Amino acid sequence: MIQVIVNGAAQRFDRPLNVQALLEQLAIAGKKVAVERNGEIVPKSAHAQTVIGDGDQLEIVVAVGGG
């Protein structure tokens, strides 16, 4: 089991997962998002290859349109 911090809140997962899988679990896959892992921006092209490990800190921002 791993524990990560997502937007300031601790979350536990049964196994390590990649950024894409995390976005799917959070029901925000496919939306315009910016992901930061341990202070580094994760490009969308790297979401499937970037593994989230125990103790990682993530900030996820979802773009919202408006006017």
Q: Which stretches of residues belong to each language-model region?
A:
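Ubiquitin-like/PB1-type beta-grasp interaction modules and other compact soluble beta-rich domains
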Residues: 1-66
